[in-house]
């Protein structure tokens, strides 16, 4: 160790004279105290117990090599602690090596024992940790020792009888060589199949009749009479028959709103069916087919309407059961949609007449009920009016299944029953377009013998050349008959041939219907010449009652909607019947629409087909194209400029 100059630091930097003097004094002091300091260090080492140091190191090892619990201290901290303890123990060894060799030998034995214990702990810890991460497949299996000769090999399958591998699934239809090797061993007690092998499945083909008879009662499988078995399961007793029929009809009777009396009728029908089915073992499907055919023939002979029932049942008991429970209008509508016969309570809802439906085979059921209502029931006009609102033809679209609840209407304004207010709300949806070959629904307006009000004529189908779009006609779910007042359906009226239909955003239905002359021989006035003018906006729900009966009825017809598919007997004749009236009304009153347009011009910058004032008798424009709207707009601008 070389001597450094006192005039510079360790790095060679020059020191101040004061610092140089202090450094020299310190050196002299250290030289004097070196012996004393060495004696102090030796005394401190002698005060320490080497056995306690060994025990501390063992605790650290147990903490480090514990396979169950993670060490509380970090691995680096454990190493530092062990290092310090080890250095201290080594200094003690050096101290006693010089001063007391006997103690030095004892301390060496303690150190060797400690190292052995630490090695065992480390080995155990590594074994446990490796066992947790090792894979079973990687462990080598020991060699199998030779089996002693005194073991009986009766139950041990020979190599020819044992499966080739435990990982392969051999087929039951494999080569029979394995079975042949087993055959000589059958007499010696060897099982036919080796342990773990499953016998092959049943042979292909239908099971023998003995098996069928054995399991026929449990499983219900009979090869010769499956319909009879199904009938016995369903219709073994009247209770089971009722349950079976109710289960068959549960989806329609519950979802479509069938009344409970229909279920009672089905119960009576099913009890009769159960008696007959037990005797002749016919299937329900055949009986229902025969019953529907016979009932269809009966209803065609009656010419009063279809009455599709699910079993033949006398009408008297059916009427008795129907009088037991009231039928809501929604249930009556659903019954008609499903083709069921309407009970007596539901017949009060009908407004159809028989003469209108002489040619209609699909819609004749509702008109049959209307005829019975006019002949048998002498209800007041208000009752008929309230019920007229709640009915819908059976051909209504599925969107009409959700109908608003009935509301009490105003007193009738004339001898024919007038419908009440329609519940406010948006239209229930667009009706489907007229199907090709739809059954006739319309009659000539002047046909004699009409009893009660003529239902509102259906709009004509789409004329030839019209681009595809929403089909004309009112939304489903509203009564045919004199239309009730209410918010309008947002449907454009059907366009005549040659005029493209207006876009939905460019026009609204007019507010007031045209006051054209009614066809002769009708009371109340005939339906609108243009059946597309369906309704008015909600501002015209309340009309002044000072109007005469004719005006009030026509005003109500403006807001009417009917919920049947458009059905036309002669499309060309029916379409051309209404076209000239609609065109004439539009051309005569084109100037009358300028007043509301000019009045609302400041509110909306887009020209829209407005309607005439509410109280005036002027007729609104029924069909307007872009050219008509633009022409009216230019006239307004000329008047303003």
UniProtKB/Swiss-Prot annotation:
Biased composition, Basic residues: where in the chain? 28-37
Phosphotyrosine modification sites are 236
- Provide ranges: composition bias, Basic and acidic residues: 276-304, 366-380
- Name the major location: nucleus
Localization recorded for this chain is: Nucleus; Cytoplasm
Effect recorded for residue 308 to A: Impairs interaction with PP1
Motif interval(s): PGR: 455-466
| Stretches with biased composition (Pro residues) | 192-210, 405-447, 456-504, 510-530
**GO biological-process terms attached to the record:** mRNA processing; RNA splicing; rRNA processing
Q: Where is this region: Required for nuclear import?
A: 1-45
Q: Where is this region: Required for nuclear export?
A: 633-641
Point to the regions of Polar residues compositional bias: 1-11
Phosphoserine occurs at which residues?
181, 237, 279, 283, 353, 361, 364, 600
Sorted UniProt keywords = Acetylation, Coiled coil, Cytoplasm, Isopeptide bond, Methylation, mRNA processing, mRNA splicing, Nucleus, Phosphoprotein, rRNA processing, Ubl conjugation
What results from gene inactivation? Answer: Mutant embryos die prior to 8.5 dpc. Heterozygous null mice are small and exhibit defects in axial skeleton, kidneys and esophagus.
Omega-N-methylarginine modified-residue sites: 192
Pfam families of this UniProt entry? Wbp11 (PF09429)
Where is the sequence biased in composition, kind Low complexity?
381-404
Where does the source fall among the domains of life? Eukaryota
Q: Which residues form the Glycyl lysine isopeptide (Lys-Gly) (interchain with G-Cter in SUMO2) crosslink? A: 557, 572
Region: Disordered; residue ranges are 1-37, 188-213, 236-550, 588-620
* Task performed by this protein: Activates pre-mRNA splicing. May inhibit PP1 phosphatase activity.
Write down what this protein is called. WW domain-binding protein 11
User: What taxonomic ancestry is recorded?
Assistant: Eukaryota, Metazoa, Chordata, Craniata, Vertebrata
Q: Which gene encodes it?
A: Wbp11
